Design a protein with these regions (language model features):
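Polytopic transmembrane helical bundles with strong interfacial aromatic enrichment
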Residues: 1-201
């Protein structure tokens, strides 16, 4: 798994360097594209170094969290780059309430990722203690309940977005994909808790 992870990371880094090269073709129309492409390359380098420190630290939870957040930042910048080079065809309506709800949903999702990493940290501590798997989550810490309960907050926030998008006919079609993936994510968490947590252990 580690080899595959490094191989994919190397290919992704190469793709970013190629994208930086082609970004110079937009230097007259969109100069910030060069800066953003260069920023992505820097972030990819930082991510590669951070990935090494994660492995060297034997999967330190705090470094894993930073590693994941850095990955999300890279994806966010890449999506912005894709948006900036596309033709600006207005296919959606604007609604201030919806905009701030999206910001709230993003913040809640990042918080949920951090809570999930803390849960994993507590489980790793219990696993290292040598206790049988059956008792790993018999008396979980408060972070576990926070992570579980917070998923409901994230779900209802995105349900609100889904409902407002339909009611106001804003035209954001990707909200359907978000809802599907979110439900799948929650289902996977429930499955891990009630059947075999963590998988492969």
């Amino acid at each position: 798994v580690e080899y595959i992870n490094r191989l994919i990371g190397a290919l992704a880094g190469l793709a970013c360097v190629i994208a930086l090269f082609f970004s110079f073709g937009y230097r007259k129309e969109n100069k910030k594209l060069i800066f953003l492409s260069f920023l992505i390359c820097l972030l990819m380098g930082f991510q590669a170094w951070l990935g090494k420190t994660v492995v060297d630290s034997v999967l330190n939870p705090y470094k894993i969290t930073t590693h994941m957040l850095a990955a999300l930042l890279i994806v966010a910048v890449q999506l912005f780059v894709i948006y900036s080079v596309q033709e600006k065809l207005k296919t959606t309506a604007f609604n201030a309430e919806f905009k701030w709800a999206v910001v709230a949903a993003l913040g809640l999702t990042i918080a949920q990722i951090i809570f999930g990493t803390q849960v994993r940290e507590s489980v790793d501590t219990i696993v290292e203690s040598g206790l049988p798997k059956e008792v790993w989550l018999q008396n979980p810490k408060g972070g576990f309940y926070m992570h579980r309960s917070f998923s409901i907050v994230v779900l209802f926030t995105n349900l609100f977005l889904f409902w407002r998008n339909r009611e106001l006919k804003l035209g954001f079609k990707r909200i359907n994909w978000i809802m599907g993936l979110l439900c799948l994510e929650i289902l996977s968490g429930i499955t891990m808790y009630y059947f075999n947590f963590p998988f492969g252990s």
